[in-house]
């Protein structure tokens, strides 16, 4: 069953985020992940609160693969780069199992 990584971010440093994107793309591919959508074209339909600047949904083959990617030796060095590029008060990485 597929699993999804939902990413919410507000950008602090666009150049660092681009560097992260370039470096993380082949690591995601190695784990069979693909972006379903990404960008800033989201709207709040109900509820209250601030929206992040960007969102993404990444599909993985299953939850075990998603967790293996996150914990992998290839991805661990990229976490600090990602964190330096975004506002830590608005960033969230959320996992969701597919139905």
Name these PLM-found stretches.
Residues 1-75, 95-99:
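Short S/T/G/P-rich N-terminal loop/turn motif that feeds into the first structured element of a domain
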């Amino acid at each position: 069953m597929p699993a999804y990584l939902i990413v919410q971010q507000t950008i602090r440093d666009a150049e660092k985020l681009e560097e992260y994107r370039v470096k993380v793309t082949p690591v995601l591919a190695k784990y069979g992940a693909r972006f379903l959508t990404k960008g800033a074209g989201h709207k709040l339909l109900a509820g209250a609160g601030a929206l992040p600047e960007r969102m993404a949904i990444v599909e993985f083959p299953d939850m075990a693969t998603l967790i293996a990617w996150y914990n992998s030796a290839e991805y661990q060095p990229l976490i600090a780069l990602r964190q330096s590029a975004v506002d830590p008060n608005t960033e969230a990485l959320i996992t969701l199992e597919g139905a």
